[in-house]
Amino acid sequence: MSHQTKENVLFISGIDTNVGKTVATGMIAKALAKAGKKVITQKMIQTGCEHVSEDIEAHRQIQGIPFTDEDTRGLTCPYIFTYPCSPHMAAAKDGRRIDLDTITQSTRRLRETYEYVLLEGAGGLMVPNDMESCLLYTSPSPRDRTRSR
């Protein structure tokens, strides 16, 4: 059964790092699940860790559930970088590039399975994604997912 609508992706953001986005995302997911909704959380880009998104791990702990199949396949966090800084700098330090289509496709696949996707941003709304755009992700649509700086 497909649940794909523009309205089923909720973007969780804050004004900076360490302002409570991760806890808020986990708590909202837990409340939606308790209300009988099929929900998953997603972190577009995680910096400062290796192999596993620490924020996705925190979401699952708050929700009281184990890692999902989507977590192990990387759909819930398409980009993990080791250096703890803004996504564009962390990608450069790791010698990698952030492809916005990869993030969009991951979100689209989650939308097809879940009633709600809670999409946690990295840092604040205007955190640079690369040298030309930021990840102001206002819609799952590829047309309007970025905003030029």
Model-predicted regions and their roles:
Residues 130-136:
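Charged helix-capping and loop-helix junction motifs
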Residues 26-95:
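N-terminal phosphate/diphosphate-binding loop that engages ATP/GTP or pyrophosphate donors
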Residues 137-149:
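Single conserved hydrophobic/aromatic residue that forms the stacking wall/gate
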Residues 1-10:
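Extreme N-terminal, non-catalytic leader segments
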Residues 18, 45, 122-123:
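Anionic group-transfer/hydrolysis microenvironments
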Residues 13-14:
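Residues at the beta-strand->loop junction immediately N-terminal to the Walker
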Residues 21:
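Conserved lysine of the Walker
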Residues 87-128:
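Phosphate-binding/switch loop-helix module in NTP-utilizing enzymes
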